[in-house]
């Protein structure tokens, strides 16, 4: 199962308390399984069937580029973080 992490800001926004192990072969199924554990969490993570604008998904240290279709391995570490902007 993948380990899913949120930063402090996301924990407060979602009520998510820390790290959780969930099954899933891609981000879409990981989020669906998170929704079973934490009803309503998909409203913070998903917008129009993709990752919420302003949110980044990091899988095993790599920033995802294809949204909910990103592959997740059995032992992956998944982080949902607010996207960083710069100028």
Predicted regions: what they are:
Residues 1-86:
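Ubiquitin-like/PB1-type beta-grasp interaction modules and other compact soluble beta-rich domains
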